[in-house]
Amino acid sequence: DSTRKSYPKSAIFEKVGYWRGYEWASQFRNIGVKTWDANANETEAWVNSPYRKGEDHIGRAYGAQLRRWKGHDGKEIDQLMSVYERIRSGKDDRGLIMTFYNPGEFELGALRPCLHTHQFSILGDGLYLESQQRSNDTANGQSFNQIQIFWTLYTMAAITGLKPKKAVQNIANAHI
């Protein structure tokens, strides 16, 4: 058998959890996603971290960074709503960027993000997406991440009234 089974529902619902700002594996499990169980409860460095708040805590990883990024003044920035509102208004300032990659808070989360940045562009009535990934296990994660990227483009286009056009995935370190 030369094809690997893909799990589109898990990929999409994991992204839904990020968009909701989840910080607990139990929140993901409540929507049918088990992808965070091991990172939250079995990764030795995180299990022993003084920043871990208990069983199932994933910390300030993906969802927390997306919905509650800490600004220089301590105020929280909701990257998702900021980008959504600018896309919906048709304002492409070449800064329609959502990122989960916050080096100042790596120790506050279970792991550093692999698929870490999404940058949108508006051209006419079309929405484009370019996504950056620092690391990719091609055998296990590639199809999962591609589903998430396409879902991100199609969903953002749908809720902003634009047409989804093209998604590009840039991978810096692909490995087997």
Language model: regions and residue ranges:
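Terminal, non-catalytic protein-protein interaction segments that mediate quaternary/complex assembly
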Residues: 1-176
